[in-house]
């Protein structure tokens, strides 16, 4: 990270804080492709990876400004073999390179803006699991919640205009505008198999989307008092807190005139706001009538000030006591636990019924089994099946792959209140691994386990217990109690692919 900062600061100082020349630097694409910095950045290596060739990048960017020749024709005899076979390769290259440049540049600005300020910076808050302790502490005292799907911009120019306030380099903005206008259909149809944007190349769109969301997030005055729970200095693929701290100091002064009629909505001290990717949760202690006003305010707010068209039907008002939130791979709700207390005064006895609210998180077993079925670990009914593997893979490699998936799922879903569903998922993965090994050795599962022993699959059972036994080495009863309770880990920076079933 320090080497990347040094190179970016060097180039930006030479180019007067312009980002456009960085697009023609070969090492930018080497970093974007995770090739490291072990090559010289001053000389072009002819034998270097073709995908990161400086000459190819220059030729591709030149073609972007040729309006009638933006798409490379396969029948063009003047085109070399490389361009003829890879019509969409240059779009992926420029997307990765530009995303890397803006991410690292804005992260440097964020770090410099935080220097000298007394802002709590904890690496633990980079974990997405840190959201759930916040929900546990606050949501059990609230009544209503707005479950919102954030609308997407309908035109690429909206994203460019948002970035225009931060990037003063006109050439970079023109390049981004050309790129988005030509590939907007690919960006908004990311789920199509024929899309030229792979998961890796979606990071530019995610960066632009989060920068746009950050603009209207900063207007919410109530975040001024609650921002201590949301601070995160992570600068990975998603930068959601860029310039948030600088804007929050002048919120009331800038927006008081425009929102005089609606500022009373923000005076509720029990409003809490949580967002992850494209889903937003707004919870309050107020009545459903107040939340309904919030609902229509957000719709008009997005349309009038940010040109985002949202239907009121995409915003749901629910009671926390009788509704579960499908959020980040968990079903979260506030459960009412009644408790009977017997009180006696002299000769009279009383029974007092107390109700305690408890924040509950459950594992959505049906969608998760659907994800496992899609990944060919089981069928749609949850019955384990064998996965086809390469013949050159050893047994230890197969077990290690299954064990890694099982550990990741157990690690992420350790916060579930009830472990029964998690045990079922581990059982599916364990039996799927056994069937895969038996298929490789052309035998039945029973014969395979009898031959090699059931200890071959112990990795599925000992992963989590070993971690907890190191934490609580003395009392086995304490270990069992902790193992059955919710555990939130502070080292999870992304949601598991199988858990992200939405």
UniProtKB/Swiss-Prot annotation:
Key word Magnesium present: no
Entry's family note: Belongs to the intron maturase 2 family. MatK subfamily.
Name the UniProt record assigns to this protein: Maturase K
Gene that produces this protein: matK
GO cellular component: chloroplast
Main location: plastid
Keyword field contains RNA-binding: yes
Single biological process term from Gene Ontology: RNA splicing
Pfam families: Intron_maturas2 (PF01348), MatK_N (PF01824)
Signal peptide: none
Keywords: Chloroplast, mRNA processing, Plastid, RNA-binding, tRNA processing
HAMAP family named in the record: MatK
Function: Usually encoded in the trnK tRNA gene intron. Probably assists in splicing its own and other chloroplast group II introns.
Species lineage: Eukaryota, Viridiplantae, Streptophyta, Embryophyta, Tracheophyta
Organism: Ehretia anacua
GO MF annotation terms: RNA binding
Compartments, as annotated in UniProt: Plastid, Chloroplast
């Amino acid at each position: 990270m320090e080497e990347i900062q040094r190179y970016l600061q060097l180039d930006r100082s030479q180019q007067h804080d312009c980002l456009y020349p960085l697009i023609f630097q070969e090492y930018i694409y080497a970093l974007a492709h995770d090739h490291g910095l072990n090559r010289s950045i001053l000389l072009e290596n002819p034998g270097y990876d073709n995908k990161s060739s400086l000459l190819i990048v220059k030729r591709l960017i030149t073609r972007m400004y040729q309006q009638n020749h933006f798409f490379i024709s396969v029948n063009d005899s003047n085109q070399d073999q490389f361009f003829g076979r890879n019509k969409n390769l240059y779009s992926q290259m420029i997307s990765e390179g530009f995303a890397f440049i803006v991410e690292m540049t804005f992260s440097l600005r964020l770090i410099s803006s935080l220097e000298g300020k007394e802002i709590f910076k904890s690496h633990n808050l980079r974990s997405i699991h840190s959201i759930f302790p916040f929900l546990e502490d606050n949501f059990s005292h609230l009544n209503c919640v707005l479950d919102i799907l954030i609308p997407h911009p309908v035109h690429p120019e909206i994203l460019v205009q948002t970035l225009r306030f931060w990037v003063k380099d006109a050439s970079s903005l023109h390049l981004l505008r050309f790129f988005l206008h030509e590939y907007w259909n690919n960006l908004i149809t990311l789920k199509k198999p024929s899309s030229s944007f792979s998961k890796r190349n979606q990071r530019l769109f995610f960066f632009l989307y989060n920068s746009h969301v950050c603009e209207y997030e900063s207007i919410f005055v109530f975040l001024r008092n609650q921002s201590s729970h949301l601070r995160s200095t992570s600068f990975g693929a998603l930068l959601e807190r860029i310039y948030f701290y600088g804007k929050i100091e002048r919120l009331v002064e800038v927006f008081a005139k425009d929102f005089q009629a609606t500022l009373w909505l923000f005076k509720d001290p029990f409003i809490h706001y949580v967002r992850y990717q494209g889903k937003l949760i707004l919870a309050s202690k107020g009545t459903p009538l107040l939340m309904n006003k919030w609902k229509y305010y957000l719709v008009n707010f997005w349309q009038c000030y940010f040109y985002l068209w949202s239907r009121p039907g995409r915003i749901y008002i629910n009671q926390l006591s009788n509704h579960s939130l499908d959020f980040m791979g968990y079903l979260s709700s506030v459960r009412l636990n009644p408790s009977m207390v017997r009180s006696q005064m002299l000769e009279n006895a009383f029974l007092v019924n107390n109700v305690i609210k408890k924040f509950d998180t459950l594992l959505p077993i049906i969608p998760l089994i659907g994800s496992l079925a899609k990944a060919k670990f089981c069928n749609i009914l949850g019955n384990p099946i064998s996965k086809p593997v390469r013949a050159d893979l050893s047994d230890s490699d197969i077990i290690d792959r299954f064990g890694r998936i099982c550990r990741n799922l157990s690690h992420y879903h350790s916060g579930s209140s009830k472990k029964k569903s998690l045990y079922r998922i581990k059982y599916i993965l364990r039996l799927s691994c056994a069937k895969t090994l038996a298929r490789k050795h052309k035998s039945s599962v029973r014969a395979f386990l009898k031959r090699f022993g059931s200890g071959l699959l112990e990795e599925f059972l000992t992963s989590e217990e070993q971690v907890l036994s190191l934490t609580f080495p003395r009392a086995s009863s304490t270990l069992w109690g902790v193992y059955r309770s919710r555990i939130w880990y502070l080292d999870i920076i992304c949601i598991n692919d199988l858990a992200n079933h939405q």
